[in-house]
Amino acid sequence: MSSAANLPSPSPSPPIRTDVLIVGAGPVGLFAAFEAGVIGLSCQIVDGLDKVGGQCIELYPDKPIYDIPAIPSCTARELVERLLAQCRPFDPPIHLEQRVESVEQGGDGRWTVRTDRGLVFDVAAILLAAGNGAFVPQKLALAEAVPLESRHVHYSVPRLADFAGKTVVVAGGGDSALDWALALRKVARRVTLVHRRSGFSAADSSVESMRRAVEAGEMDFVVGAIAGLDVEDDALKSITLRHIEGETQLAAEHLVALYGLVADLGPIAQWGLSIHGGRVDVDTSNYESSRPGIFAVGDIAHYPNKQKLILSGFHEASLALRKAYSYAYPEKKRVHVHSSYDAKLAEKVSAAG
């Protein structure tokens, strides 16, 4: 029997061919997918996160949004759900946990785009709707934390079962920290939530649930900042907390630090684009970058008097895609049709409903 090492390497999958690759599955990226379908462009979406919604869902899923036209108030989660429903008639494929790594333009003007997990796309245009770039966890500024990552120090909770019967400290004051502390208390031997102050940036309902759990003796809450980790035999033993009264030690086998996400342009910064303050410079007539065929919309776009509003991103995506059409179909002249009179669109919406 041949060993795996002696078997021929599997041939790589052929590139996925589409008109536009949308980088980012946040609100602007989702609306762009709908708008692409409306004007006759095929598209696919990639996002480095494990869920649709981008910054909205990662940072403030249940916070109200008041400045979306015709929607007096909705949560970020509700907005994302509505945008998903809106683009459903065109059923755009969405590839999650795929970070775009490299782009290369061929002699025919089309782009080859590769992700960190092996997907390859052959596209006429690229629409960057990646918010402030990829989001990465804000990590502890402690050297001793690095060798413990994924074993005793964590920046996410892949599986609750991994913490069964353990002493766990959850650090942070946002929705993610409180929600995971509440979930972990059901499987861990003991859970302690640590935050630098007694106030939180989480939803009121989460804060109330946490306080009830503390009062019931189901978990603990301590005000303080993590100042150090006590490591013994390559394992976490305790955490040093700094607070007004001084320093104390808190026993812990696992530390889950949920300080939120920080923006990182990542490989996009190496694409040869004109960048200003971590954002991509664009021409406001069509939101095209300094490299023709690559567009930037939403928070990642930079231009004079730029407003970081979801509404602005919708407008930017609409204009960018109309220019992208000329790259996908250079021989065609696109004819504008108001959506009210677009019979094909009405048929698709009806079928999806």
From Swiss-Prot:
Catalysis: reaction(s): 2 reduced [2Fe-2S]-[ferredoxin] + NADP(+) + H(+) = 2 oxidized [2Fe-2S]-[ferredoxin] + NADPH
EC identifiers of the protein: 1.18.1.2
Keywords, ordered alphabetically: FAD, Flavoprotein, NADP, Oxidoreductase
Subunit relationships: Homodimer.
Annotated InterPro entries: FAD/NAD-bd_sf (IPR036188), FAD/NAD-binding_dom (IPR023753), Fd--NADP_Rdtase_type_2 (IPR022890), Ferredoxin-NADP_redctase_2 (IPR050097)
Cofactor(s) the protein needs: FAD
This protein's name: Ferredoxin--NADP reductase
Family: Belongs to the ferredoxin--NADP reductase type 2 family.
Cofactor note: Binds 1 FAD per subunit.
One function term, GO molecular function aspect: flavin adenine dinucleotide binding
Positions that bind FAD: D47, Q55, Y60, V100, F135, D299, S340
Organism per entry: Paraburkholderia xenovorans (strain LB400)
